[in-house]
Each structure stands twice: as structure tokens, then as C-alpha cells.
């Protein structure tokens, strides 16, 4: 209750400290609890408004039956806790969906180019949080390629090797 009443005080904290605390949340065994707490208290809207915009965003689409924020939490939950780059990539992987929404005549939605858009959007966010250039580049590359293996066949060894070299 005290956090909700004073959530705007987060603006008085240095961005480096906010970055460090976000990283601590992301590498815990249950980062979704921390991110949900940030969302529920209003802090997420201040420190990561781009992620907060995904809360409640539920276009009709074939891939997800929940809002994009909860889908993002599920992706984060299924990544390794000792890999900050992967956790950051999971956090931002669908941030491009807000700018790429297209609707089909039947009402269903899709997001052409959302991976590329997300890779672009994440860079200034991570820069704002004072992440180093190597982290920003690695996260952006993973987001850009996060749909590469979304195929209806088993990728060849060569395709997997090329993806790993790019990422």
C-alpha cells in the first residue's frame, strides 16, 4: 500500500540504480512476480512505459489467448535465470506489436514486422537505462531474430548455425 501511494518517488532514483534493480528482478527464479509487482504499483509505467503499454493489450490473434504483457511474462518464465541478455530479450520481444498491428477481414490480427520493429524500439529504451552497447546490440539481435525458428519444418543444421552466428 505504501508503494502505491508513493510510486512516483521512483523518479528521484538514478536511472543506473533502476537498471541495476531491474536486472536483479530479471535474474531471479521468479521474475514474473517482481514485474507484476512493478505493474501493480504503477512503477512499471514510469520506468518502462513501453512494456506497461502491453498490459491489457489483447488483439484477437491466433498465437495468444492472453494479453501481450502476460504472454511476455510467460516467455520470461521459460528462459534461463542466469542469462540476463535472454531475459531482457524476452522482456522486449513483443514491444513492436503496438506499432505493427494489422487486422484481417475476419477480425483476427497479426503483426507483420514486429520483430524488426521491436529490435529498433528496444535500443533507445536500453540506452535510456544506461545499458552498455554490447548488451543493447545483443538484445536487439535476439529480438530481431526471435521468429526465425517459427517454422513448420525442422530447420537444417546449417540454418541453425547461421542463426547462431547472427545472434
Q: Which residue stretches match the model-derived regions?
A:
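Glycine- and charge-enriched loop/helix tracts that form the active or gating conduit
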Residues: 1-87, 91, 95-113, 117-133
Amino acid at each position: 500500500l505504501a508503494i502505491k501511494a508513493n510510486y512516483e518517488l521512483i523518479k528521484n532514483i538514478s536511472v543506473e540504480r533502476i537498471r541495476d534493480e531491474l536486472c536483479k528482478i530479471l535474474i531471479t527464479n521468479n521474475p514474473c512476480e517482481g514485474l507484476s509487482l512493478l505493474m501493480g504499483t504503477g512503477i512499471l509505467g514510469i520506468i518502462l512505459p513501453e512494456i506497461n503499454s502491453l498490459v491489457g493489450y489483447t488483439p484477437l490473434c491466433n498465437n495468444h489467448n492472453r494479453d501481450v504483457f502476460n504472454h511476455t511474462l510467460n516467455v520470461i518464465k521459460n528462459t534461463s535465470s542466469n542469462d540476463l541478455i535472454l531475459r531482457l530479450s524476452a522482456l522486449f520481444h513483443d514491444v513492436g506489436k503496438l506499432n505493427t498491428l494489422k487486422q484481417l477481414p475476419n477480425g483476427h490480427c497479426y503483426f507483420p514486422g514486429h520483430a524488426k520493429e521491436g529490435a529498433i524500439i528496444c535500443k533507445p529504451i536500453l540506452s535510456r537505462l544506461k545499458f552498455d552497447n554490447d548488451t543493447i546490440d545483443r538484445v536487439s539481435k535476439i529480438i530481431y531474430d526471435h521468429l526465425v525458428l517459427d517454422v513448420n519444418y525442422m530447420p537444417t543444421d546449417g540454418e541453425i548455425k547461421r542463426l547462431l552466428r547472427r545472434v
